[in-house]
A protein has these predicted regions:
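Glycan-processing catalytic domains of CAZymes
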Residues: 13-397
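Bacterial N-terminal signal peptides
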Residues: 1-6
Length: 397
């Protein structure tokens, strides 16, 4: 009876009014995760010309303002870490916190006024991140920490004029930083669950506050393929960042981890909606990784899908030859073939990605060439965890 009544009401409602054109599925734009060094004047000029989004450290306010002056359309986000406080030189100056922090809460501020915000293990020791000296895990599940972090960061964004925040370490597991079990939890799984739930709360509190102020929140979401719905939930404000995009997993299968679980499906839905940013990073040690990263990003083509290759130190701005490919606009959705290969046709070319562990024979559309202008055979052997990026050949007269 209730179902029938609901259907009657729904049927009487007018069709939704379309107020604007559908978002254009454009080839990936470029962005710069510029947190490894102070940008030089020529890098700032380059960034203003080439990048849609730039992320800088909190103390780079002059660079941020220059970017806005050179290109008012570029989005400049400030780097802030959700999960740690830090006491290495630069984050602290002697026995006090620096004026501009890579985190939301300063080390000495927490040490002197809220020491309970430092997470401790079952031996009551503070948790320092392995491989990252003087990075200390914080109690992201504590409502008081969450509020203090959000209040401080939102105030700084508004005061300095940033477009928003890139919130790092929105992670799913502590294991990449420490083997510690957090006090009050029974095991590593319990610790991870506590952290995930805490970060859910931090995201909501900070995201709501920034959104109300007309500012952006883009978290760096990791391991979202392990938890269905996590990417969609954590990209719901201004988008999300994926720092290990298009790379092979470490499980020994040789497959691309990006395509596992529900993450890629959620990213496709976000890109198709076209309302928020997908900021994708591929750490490239070879041409193959660069090719796979770009082609995988092209499968997610949309008005706010940006990709970059990078070195883990993030000291330099990067540009890829694939970003000069001029793929144009996608003319179809990304298609998954029975073989497991994904393909997508663009107005200026075609991409194919093989995320599987087996080679696959693919048939590209006619009239394509490599980026070097070389002719392409009717069929191509696409190796495992590899990709093709092909462009339209010269028009026949």
């Amino acid at each position: 009876m209730l179902l029938s009544s609901a259907c009657t009401v729904s049927a009487s409602e007018p069709d939704p009014i379309i107020t604007g054109p559908a978002p254009k599925p454009l080839a990936p734009c470029a962005w710069w995760y510029g947190i490894g060094d102070t940008p030089s004047p020529w890098e700032i000029k380059l960034a203003a010309r080439h990048y849609d989004v730039v992320v800088l450290n909190a103390w780079e306010t002059a660079a941020m303002r220059k970017l806005h002056e050179l290109n008012p359309k570029v989005k400049v986000l400030v780097y802030k870490d959700f999960s740690s406080t830090r006491n290495y030189p630069g984050a602290v100056e002697g026995d006090r916190d620096a004026q501009y922090l890579p985190t939301g809460i300063g080390y000495f501020a927490a040490e002197r006024t809220q020491p309970e915000w430092f997470a401790i293990d079952t031996l009551k020791q503070r948790i320092e991140w392995r491989g990252y000296p003087k990075h200390w895990q914080m109690t992201v599940w504590d409502p008081a920490y969450q509020k203090a972090w959000a209040d401080a960061v939102v105030a700084e964004v508004l005061r300095e004029g940033w477009d928003g925040v890139l919130a790092d370490n929105d992670f799913s597991s502590l294991k990449y930083y420490s083997s510690a079990v957090i006090a009050g939890t029974a095991d590593a799984a319990g610790s991870d669950r506590l952290l995930r739930e805490g970060l859910d709360g931090m995201l909501a509190l900070t995201g709501d506050a920034l959104e109300k102020s007309g500012k952006m929140l883009v978290p760096n979401v990791s391991e979202s393929q392990l938890t269905p719905g996590r990417w969609a939930a954590h990209s719901r404000y201004a988008g999300a960042m994926e720092e290990n995009f298009g790379l092979r997993g470490d499980d020994g299968t040789g497959e691309l981890i990006t395509f596992k679980g529900n993450q890629f499906k959620e990213q496709r839905a976000q890109a198709a909606l076209g309302e928020s940013w997908l900021l994708l990073v591929t750490h490239t040690k070879s041409d193959k990784e660069e090719r796979v990263g770009y082609a995988s990003a092209a499968l997610l083509a949309g008005p706010h899908t940006c990709w970059t290759r990078a070195h883990p130190d993030y000291k330099n701005p990067y540009w890829s030859m694939y970003q000069d490919a001029r793929l144009g606009e996608a003319v179809e959705t990304a298609n998954r073939l029975p073989s497991g290969v994904w393909t997508r046709r663009f107005s200026g070319g075609w991409v194919a990605v093989n995320p599987t562990k087996l080679s696959v024979l693919v048939t590209p559309p006619p009239g394509l060439v490599t980026l070097r202008g070389e002719a392409v055979p009717a069929q191509l052997d696409l190796p495992p965890a590899d990709a093709f990026v092909l462009v339209n050949g010269p028009k026949q007269r």
